[in-house]
Amino acid sequence: MLTRKQHELLMFIHERIKETGVSPSFDEMKEALDLASKSGIHRLITALEERGFLRRLPHRARALEVVRLPQQATAAAPPKGRAPFKPQLVEAGQAMPVAANDTRELPILGKIAAGTPIEAIQQERDRLPVPEAMLGAGEHFVLEIQGDSMINAGILDGDFVVIRRTDSANSGDIVVALVDGEEATLKRLRKKGASIALEAANPAYETRIFGPDRVAVQGRLVGLIRRYH
């Protein structure tokens, strides 16, 4: 039987590998479990290895393999605030499966990079009908995705993301982040002490870390619309 911390770490590693294709770093594991030092992570990993849940892959950095999960894992939630967010998707190939009065037209404010930041948010260029069920309180807008860095979160090049305007976000949220006041990008936000990490959902892209004064949250992802041409 696993301890609570062993179970939390195992599920965090499992979810991160499933989401990004690579195991988390020791710093990420330490932050996720709110431990004071990496030595605690080393002890937990060793215990999970001894119990046959984890395996270290030799001669590779950040190489952990989940061998098996505890029976209760399928019903257990990951550590608080660490669940990977998958946006609600509306596929608009022909007609949206909602009545016209159940939609709201939102402004499309341009393209945003799911890759290397390419441009700041622009002015309205068009409008897109979005199901009311996808929206909550507050102001919303739409951006078109350019790039593939968020594909493991289900966000593809050419998709339209629905954003709730806000200047704050929790660690783990997918956000529109404005870097240095001029470059906008869509990434998963992680808070690392006094720093902000912008994390891709594609192992081909590195996590970028900035001081808090360099990153401004412009909004949080709430939904996704995919068109087929």
UniProtKB/Swiss-Prot annotation:
Its EC number is 3.4.21.88. One of its GO terms (molecular function) is DNA binding. InterPro entries: LexA, LexA-like, LexA/Signal_pep-like_sf, LexA_DNA-bd_dom, LexA_repressor, Peptidase_S24_LexA, Peptidase_S24_S26A/B/C, WH-like_DNA-bd_sf. Residues 26-46 bind DNA. It catalyses: Hydrolysis of Ala-|-Gly bond in repressor LexA. It holds the Pfam family Peptidase_S24. It is an enzyme of class 3 (hydrolase). Keywords: Autocatalytic cleavage, DNA damage, DNA repair, DNA replication, DNA-binding, Hydrolase, Repressor, SOS response, Transcription, Transcription regulation. SUPFAM superfamilies: LexA/Signal peptidase, Winged helix' DNA-binding domain. The record marks 114-115 as: Cleavage. The active site is at residues 149, 187. It comes from the Bacteria. One of its GO terms (biological process) is proteolysis. PANTHER family: LEXA REPRESSOR, LEXA REPRESSOR-RELATED. Belongs to the peptidase S24 family. Homodimer. Represses a number of genes involved in the response to DNA damage (SOS response), including recA and lexA. In the presence of single-stranded DNA, RecA interacts with LexA causing an autocatalytic cleavage which disrupts the DNA-binding part of LexA, leading to derepression of the SOS regulon and eventually DNA repair. This is LexA repressor. The gene is lexA.
